From Swiss-Prot:
GO term, biological process aspect, one: SOS response
Domain ATP-grasp residues, every copy: 107-288
PANTHER family: BETA-CITRYLGLUTAMATE SYNTHASE B-RELATED (PTHR21621:SF0), RIBOSOMAL PROTEIN S6 MODIFICATION PROTEIN (PTHR21621)
GO molecular function terms listed in the Swiss-Prot or TrEMBL record: ATP binding; metal ion binding; ribosomal S6-glutamic acid ligase activity
Organism: Mycoplasma pneumoniae (strain ATCC 29342 / M129 / Subtype 1) (Mycoplasmoides pneumoniae)
Protein's UniProt keywords contain Acyltransferase: no
Record-annotated disulphide pairs: none
List of residues binding Mg(2+) 1: 248, 261
Keyword Cell wall biogenesis/degradation: no
Residues in the signal sequence: none
SUPFAM superfamilies: Glutathione synthetase ATP-binding domain-like
Protein name from the UniProt record: Uncharacterized protein MG012 homolog
Gene Ontology annotations for the cellular component aspect, listed alphabetically: cytoplasm
Family: Belongs to the RimK family.
Length: 288
């Protein structure tokens, strides 16, 4: 029997999603006759010899976002999925756009990377300078996002300068600012890629919120990708060095897909529900 070890953080903010994902993985492992052992990040002592680590497998499905821990596991010779560099680039929305900017064929939402130390409310003149820069780059509405955040959290729609100033004044973490894509109309496409193959695509739409996240009340239905769209998703996953991921696209004015963001530790439960298949089966089968 093949073994895979999974590492997760029990203090994960969205407890329900974490538990559902765990059950999905357990069911997938059972159907594939794989021994999947779960460990919390607290089970790993980085101050001990690697021979004393609790894993029966050299392959770690890393469900945490602790980049330092992932890098340490790699340093002792373990295969970590996703890799520390891939998690870092995907988890940081500013880095994601910087990495993909090296690939001009990947169309992205117009994005402005904000200053790293974001306490502009303490410096009114600098805050006004940044607002003027945003106004030169974009037309209202604009989207303000913390560079870290999942499930649609820390994402703000600013319809005018007053709302933008209010939003920026209350933030202390680095952000990105993006043009609001009105043609997408609270809808998006989530593409799941595993080991350079698209294993599922979902069209999502939210009637009650500008965010199209399933965790924010959006509903989903299967989406048929064209060959060009499939190639685009795989190109993004390869550029980000991600073994598996969820890529979110919006629709531009021509109804072509435009990159929004990528998720390294993608939650598979709701996508599996709408696609009527356990996506974790493809994930574990590709890892084993």
């Amino acid at each position: 029997m093949k073994h895979i070890s999974a590492v997760y953080n029990p203090a994960f903010t969205n407890i329900a999603s974490k538990l559902n994902q765990t059950e999905l993985l357990k069911d997938a492992a059972q159907s594939l006759n794989i021994q999947l052992d779960f460990f919390t990040c607290f089970d790993i002592n980085t101050n001990q010899d690697k021979t004393k680590l609790p894993f029966k497998s050299n392959t770690i499905l890393f469900l945490d976002k602790n980049i330092a821990l992932a890098q340490w596991l790699e340093s002792v010779g373990l295969r970590v999925i996703n890799s520390s560099i891939a998690i870092n680039n995907a988890d940081n929305k500013a880095l994601s756009h910087a990495v993909l900017a090296q690939h001009p064929t990947i169309k992205q939402i117009p994005t402005l990377i904000g200053p790293q130390n974001f306490r502009l409310a303490w410096y009114p003149e600098k805050l006004e300078q940044f607002i003027e820069q945003i106004k030169r780059c974009f037309q209202f509405p604009v989207i303000v996002k913390s560079i870290y955040g999942s499930f649609g959290d820390y994402v703000f729609l600013c319809k005018d300068e007053q709302k933008l100033r209010q939003t920026l004044s209350g933030l202390t973490e680095q952000i990105i600012v993006q043009q609001y894509i009105a043609t997408s109309n609270s809808e998006a496409v989530r593409v799941i890629v595993v080991n350079n193959q698209v294993v599922g695509a979902l069209h999502t739409q939210n009637e009650g919120d500008f965010r199209s996240n399933l965790n924010k009340g959006a509903v989903g239905e299967p989406y048929q990708l064209s060959q060009e769209e499939t190639k685009l998703a795989i190109t993004i996953s390869q550029a980000m060095q991600l073994f598996y991921c969820g890529i979110d696209f919006l629709f531009d004015q021509d109804r072509s897909l435009i990159f929004c963001e990528v998720n390294s530790n993608v939650q598979l439960t709701k996508s599996s529900m709408y696609l009527k298949t356990n996506l974790a089966i493809q994930l574990l089968a590709s890892i084993a």
